């Protein structure tokens, strides 16, 4: 048997083993074990079958982009249809026509080349609680990276007051994007005020302040923050 035929047979056996891998459903939790599907990608975990769709009465969307787009996981070759649920902070993947949540186990990236957008799953802290969440990479580099956190909030319904106000149904609305810094697989929220940002980079605050003044760069716009981070990376 020549090497080419042997490689083809090996590939077919791998595909077949993935297709027939035992998928079991726990009726109590509504979860499907798709672990073997992601062993190839180092994403070993359980994918949630239940996508929490808002009620029809809710106005708005859970998504920044509702469409499933072609993307890759950590730059692997296999392409999947995926979308980000900004209300649940979950990455949804479409498998055999059904949506699932990607497991939040090891940190990884999701690349949507068609829209030139990358999400990274990173550790972060919110209100004193350690979490894992998806962040959009604004500037890709091997050191400190600038990120944004996309969030959508559910606003509760407003009951009608007889003769005064109308009933307002619950609605989903996008919040202002928050700026984070990524370092060593952890996302850290960046302060909003110039003084606090300089203190954030305490060991290089003087150099950054001089750089910003010399180049007339502010501390509010994302394009200016990208320049500051790129300069900071040259100082390390």
Regions found by a protein language model. Name each.
Residues 19, 107-109, 196, 207:
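Exposed alpha-helical structural elements
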Residues 199-236:
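Long, compositionally biased interface segments
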Residues 62-189:
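Aromatic-patch recognition
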Residues 1-27, 228:
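Bacterial Sec-dependent N-terminal signal peptides
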